């Protein structure tokens, strides 16, 4: 996790023999990626050498795409975030236009960031929905060409590019730089406009056969006849997500219920998901009630995940996590009510430490790990 270490400790962490680790580290030193920081101070006996990452040997960009916004950041080789740009407008409708717009955003960021382009080794891009990181295809967004999306990005940007699912990247960001301490079995619940999971088993990201794992929002959970964007009806996402909260909030306004937002916005079309969360934090009764409803519904199904996976840690992240206790308290209560007592005792429930930066950090850290062959 980006610290300095001895060869013996690295071998234990990676489950490799010391000779294997010695060979690997030697190659990384030759490439300028790892540095030998000299002897470790010990009370007696033979003093081992300490090795660590050369933070200026290269840089990685992470791109996190949300519903209508893009976050982008730059890390050094040690994983420190050294530049970022949040909430860049991203509203083009056609997949090809969105692709071109995203390339413009990345190129603009590279032209103004604090390091020269030739020091940027790789770019990681988060995309929601079905993403196959191995082949470089995205099947939910930017799907306008049979070629791998990564290949098209590389042609346009002139730099190595990898893609991954947004929830999985967020989980990885928390694992390396966020809420995770010693835990190895983790579920990250991304409650944004949609609903997804990032799953870590025995310290490794779980992808499934084609990288499509974590489609939590598309479990059939209701007989509500609400059409999900996936084309099916009754998905969990239709009642427990940011889009569900947004839909319910507007329905209540149409039915005559009042909110602080009816005073703040002349047109209902101007209301955003973040606006609803903001007024909840200002004690808007309607917003609070609906967020609590989402938390309770979500908690019932997270209870099922706990029964199924027996994780050490469940992290709640994504846009709705910004609602704090209004989401988390009913969610915790439902988990306790609907999960098996003996199983849920093993699981801590925590809110994301990285917040809105989990995606861009996860994307850049994944780009780094893929570049050096850890994933």
Which residues does each predicted region cover?
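ATP-binding/phosphotransfer module of carbohydrate and carboxylate kinases, centering on a glycine-rich
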Residues: 1-86, 90-118, 157, 223-224, ...
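Short loop/turn motifs at secondary-structure junctions and domain boundaries
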Residues: 52, 63-66, 180-181, 188-191
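Short glycine-aspartate micro-motif
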Residues: 60-64, 120-124, 186-190, 196-198
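Short, acidic, Ser/Thr-enriched surface-loop or helix-capping motifs
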Residues: 76, 133, 200
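Hydrophobic "anchor" residues
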Residues: 81, 138, 205-206
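Glycine-rich phosphate-binding loop and adjoining helix at the ATP-binding site
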Residues: 84-85, 89-185, 326-338
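Active-site glycine-centered loops adjacent to acidic/histidine catalytic or metal-binding residues
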Residues: 166, 192, 363
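Glycine-rich phosphate-binding loop of actin/hexokinase-like ATP-binding domains
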Residues: 182-240
